[in-house]
Amino acid sequence: MSFSDCVIKSEYRSLIDNVVQDFYLPILHEAVSYKRAVGFFSSSALAEISKGICDMASNGGKIQIVASPYLSEEDVKAIQEGYQNRETYIKKKVLKQIQDEDVSNDYYTLERLNLLTKLIEDGILDIKLAYTENNGGIGMYHEKMGLMEDSSGNIVAFSGSMNESATAMEVNYETIDVFCSW
């Protein structure tokens, strides 16, 4: 199956659609690449879309995130630990951990920092921080867009108000516009 076999709307609104269930999970299930640029990133987003990430990792997929440096202290530590330990862990360990069908979503929420660390350790996730040059010190990188690619080379691009956090995915009123390459 490829993206072209999925039902993809041209717009998702969080008060109408379940963006995680209706957009992220089906697309990540088919994806081999997920590139995201956001103003704010939180490991809570990984917990929300962990099933899709697991599917993508099983496809040999990779995630690349560019975000502003406004991260929680916990996420900074998890990211640092992930990069420090990247070479010492085997990819199958993280796949086994997040593939367990008997594990509840509460586990993912509780283990979000461990998930962030493991995805980085295993080379599945890379995070880069974007800084802006400004005169007053008040500007920040705040773009919000994403690209996902499947094994057939089909691309789904999206942009809108949504950051990469559980709050954006589950609580806020957010809109994304979606564009398909086919």
Model regions: which residues?
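PLD/PLD-like phosphodiesterase catalytic module centered on the HKD motif
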Residues: 1-182
